Amino acid sequence: MSTLRLLISDSYDPWFNLAVEECIFRQMPATQRVLFLWRNADTVVIGRAQNPWKECNTRRMEEDNVRLARRSSGGGAVFHDLGNTCFTFMAGKPEYDKTISTSIVLNALNALGVSAEASGRNDLVVKTAEGDRKVSGSAYRETKDRGFHHGTLLLNADLSRLANYLNPDKKKLAAKGITSVRSRVTNLTELLPGITHEQVCEAITEAFFAHYGEHVEAEIISPDKTPDLPNFAETFARQSSWEWNFGQAPAFSHLLDERFTWGGVELHFDVEKGHITRAQVFTDSLNPAPLEALAGRLQGCLYRADMLQQECEALLVDFPEQEKELRELSAWIAGAVR
């Protein structure tokens, strides 16, 4: 019986693909070597310890229907589209060794005619007339008895969109999360015009087989049928939840300020695990009572635009004469935290 397992996903859903990855990783035998190939439609993928409000332009993502997905490995934020090929290598310990999986990817690129090399802790670069350019980034996860190495290869990604979603709004965030380091990147199509996702997957697969001296049939994972993986439904529900993708953000503080015709407002939030743990409101409004009441209501509230808007509008019952001001405030807060 082969020790290899090859899985290829037909889904472009990042939550689906990351749930598949997690389920395979948790239940794989210690003697198995796994290669999982996949890609995501428009998504910002953040590291396990990152703060999405700091890393991403969450408002622009919402406008453009770009998903946010938190992965279980560390590292920085990346933008995925269908111009990226994603790979995951898994193995039990002590065999797990990220230098092996890195060499498999380098061998695959070499077979395609691209000479690349490892750079730093987790990048693959090619040499160009303008200097080294990154074509692949990776992240890693290890438990007591197993490990995985996953990464992306830039085939024909829309690099102009990176800045749309990975450059955050100028929010006044004093965050404790890990800030992504931006690198100069290039697409493989600059070196191999017309290269496709299927060709890259085939090259990685062949390099994987060659390294281990075995072949195995690919298992196609399709969103049309629930994968036959232990606890997949629960894992997918968690991976796609607001609580995981946003609520797992490290503790941070957020300062919002705005001047309205009726006065200036300054809001100070402390946020932990996606909930407001402290809210302070400062204003020079001639009628500060609704704002003072709002500070109390926001304590414990989810740091989510619709929930904050709901708390603002709930004050209309007690302060009907301030309806105009409260609706302006509600719209501003909801827009500011998206």
Swiss-Prot record:
Residue sites binding (R)-lipoate per the record: K134
Keyword terms of this UniProt record: ATP-binding, Cytoplasm, Ligase, Nucleotide-binding
Pathway in which the depicted protein is active: Protein modification; protein lipoylation via exogenous pathway; protein N(6)-(lipoyl)lysine from lipoate: step 1/2; Protein modification; protein lipoylation via exogenous pathway; protein N(6)-(lipoyl)lysine from lipoate: step 2/2
Catalyzed reactions: L-lysyl-[lipoyl-carrier protein] + (R)-lipoate + ATP = N(6)-[(R)-lipoyl]-L-lysyl-[lipoyl-carrier protein] + AMP + diphosphate + H(+)
GO molecular function ontology, one term from the record: lipoate-protein ligase activity
GO CC terms of this entry: cytosol
GO BP of this protein: protein modification process
Subcellular location: Cytoplasm
Binding, ATP: R71, G76, A77, V78, F79, K134
InterPro entries according to UniProt: aa-tRNA-synth_II/BPL/LPL, BPL_LPL_catalytic, Lipoate_ligase_A, Lipoate_protein_ligase_C, LipoylTrfase_LipoateP_Ligase
Name of the top EC class for this enzyme: ligase
Pfam families, sorted: Lip_prot_lig_C (PF10437), LplA-B_cat (PF21948)
Occurrences of domain BPL/LPL catalytic (ranges): 29-216
Gene3D superfamilies from the UniProt entry: Bira Bifunctional Protein, Domain 2 (3.30.930.10), CO dehydrogenase flavoprotein, C-terminal domain (3.30.390.50)
Family matches, as PROSITE patterns: BPL_LPL_CATALYTIC
Entry keyword Coiled coil: no
EC annotation from Swiss-Prot or TrEMBL: 6.3.1.20
PANTHER family registered for this protein in UniProt: LIPOATE-PROTEIN LIGASE, LIPOYLTRANSFERASE 1, MITOCHONDRIAL
Note: In the transfer reaction, the free carboxyl group of lipoic acid is attached via an amide linkage to the epsilon-amino group of a specific lysine residue of lipoyl domains of lipoate-dependent enzymes.
HAMAP family, per database record: LplA (MF_01602)
Subunit field text: Monomer.
Family of the protein in this entry: Belongs to the LplA family.
Function: Catalyzes both the ATP-dependent activation of exogenously supplied lipoate to lipoyl-AMP and the transfer of the activated lipoyl onto the lipoyl domains of lipoate-dependent enzymes.
Protein name as it appears in the record: Lipoate-protein ligase A
